[in-house]
Swiss-Prot record:
This is Adenylosuccinate synthetase. It comes from Mycolicibacterium gilvum (strain PYR-GCK). The gene is purA. Its EC number is 6.3.4.4. Belongs to the adenylosuccinate synthetase family. Substrate binds at residues 299-305.
Length: 431
């Protein structure tokens, strides 16, 4: 059976948790393959219960699904334990969560350095969440990181942390005038935390490939979005990992030929958190309307999201760099009650028209949107369950987005609940 990749096709916050939750009952495995607790998924169950997840895959809320934190994720042990306890306190079975032995651990010095560097950056800061994600990935690439499996050997763990702090403390004390961290204290705290998760450590790549050989379905769940990818996003205003579909293989250990479907998640308008270019951003009453009606506040950061009209340029770009086969369009209901609904179909940069993503970041920053206006609709669509239940103008909007994005819109979200979804094509049946 196939592996299916689920990715954000904009700047994150597209509603990936809803998509995972919808598919979760028909898959056997859900894998988080990159990022850390710098992103969040919100899942609303049919009972009305609302869950905000940051590290743990959304499949944890579906009985019978095995969930994996893959090797591409950076794991803050304290956040992991807090999230597990929060789920267990609400009656969620967490026994089905495994953690790749090769995932990297986010350490206290990563958080300290992240916060102080961002503070000293002043006006040039990139809007990091301050959770240590970037510094942890830096250590991973520099081959100085602490892996999850290291907690199984206290002597090796102590040696690695002592070596890391020789340099980190120099940076904290001599450059930023901060207090040094005690290696023994860091080791002791981590080993204490490890008692709460070391029974979950597994050879994830082996288990996942064995599952595929047994014809089980594996859903690979990305965090953030395409335009935040460190290689393909609006650099330097990006995350430190690869949320794009290519990162799914690297961050899970599943070979690319195993992947048969790439499901992109698109919000019916566009949002972004933090700094960076955003060609369709709105600063008027329409932006305020989208923010209020869409509840646009970051799950992890609590920061208000910047809002703008749908940008077909970045949707086409996401289709291309991810090889997207299907789209899940979310929050279509938010656009009800608008007289017209503009779609960005291209840009002008220094007076020249382009329908593609500009090659340089300076050009993206100067890009002015070219809009095509579609008539809006006034009906409440939250009860629609079939495509034909939508008003004609809402259907026209979806079909135009589909045409511009270059991939089939297979699912449409018309509200936050799991059941508030229109399925036009069964993604699993076509995989």
């Amino acid at each position: 059976m196939p592996a299916i990749v689920l990715i954000g096709a904009q700047w994150g916050d597209e509603g990936k948790g809803k998509a995972t939750d919808l598919l979760g009952g028909r898959v056997q495995w859900v894998v988080r393959y990159q990022g850390g607790n710098n992103a969040g998924h919100t899942v609303v169950l049919p009972t009305g219960e609302n869950f905000a997840l940051h590290l743990i895959p959304s499949g944890i809320l579906t009985p019978g699904v095995t969930n994996v934190i893959g090797n591409g994720v950076v794991v803050d042990p304290g956040v992991l334990l807090t999230e597990l306890k929060g789920l267990e306190d609400r009656g969620v079975d967490t026994d089905r969560l495994l953690i790749s032995a090769d995932a990297h651990l986010l350490m206290p010095y990563h958080v300290a350095i992240d916060k102080v560097v961002e503070r000293y950056a002043g006006s040039k800061k990139i809007g990091t969440t301050g959770r240590g994600i970037g510094p942890c990935y830096q250590d991973k690439i520099a081959r100085q990181g602490i892996r999850v499996a290291d907690v199984l050997d206290p002597a090796v763990l102590a040696e690695k942390i002592e070596g890391a702090l020789e340099l980190k403390n120099q940076v904290l004390v001599k450059i930023y005038n901060r207090k040094a961290l005690e290696p023994a204290e860091v080791v002791e705290n981590l080993l204490e935390q490890a008692e709460g998760f070391k029974h979950r450590i597994a050879d994830a790549r082996l288990l996942l490939n064995e599952a595929l050989e047994r014809d089980e379905i594996v859903l690979l769940e990305g965090s953030q979005g395409t335009l935040l990818d460190v290689d393909h996003g609006t650099y330097p205003y990006v995350t430190s990992s690869n949320p794009t579909a290519g990162g799914a293989s690297v961050g899970s250990g599943i070979g690319p030929t195993r992947i048969t479907t790439v499901l992109g998640i698109l919000k019916a308008y566009t949002t972004r958190v933090g700094s960076g270019p955003f060609p369709t951003e709105l600063f008027d009453e329409h932006g305020a309307y989208l923010a209020k009606t869409g509840g646009e506040v970051g799950v992890t950061t609590g920061r208000a999201r910047r809002c703008g009209w749908f940008d077909a340029v970045i949707a086409r770009y996401a289709t291309r760099v991810n090889g997207i086969t299907d789209y899940f369009l979310t929050k279509l209901d938010v656009l009800s009650s608008l007289e017209t609904v503009p779609i960005c179909v291209g840009y002008t940069v220094d007076g020249k028209r382009t329908d593609e993503m500009p090659m340089t970041q300076s050009d993206i920053a100067r890009a002015e949107p070219v809009y095509e206006e579609l008539p809006g609709w006034w009906e409440d669509i939250s009860g629609a369950r079939e495509f034909d239940d939508l008003p004609a103008k809402a259907r026209d909007y979806v079909l135009r987005l589909e045409e511009l994005a270059g991939a089939h819109v297979s699912c449409i979200g018309v509200g936050p609940g799991r059941d508030q979804t229109i399925v036009r094509r069964d993604i699993l049946a076509t995989s």
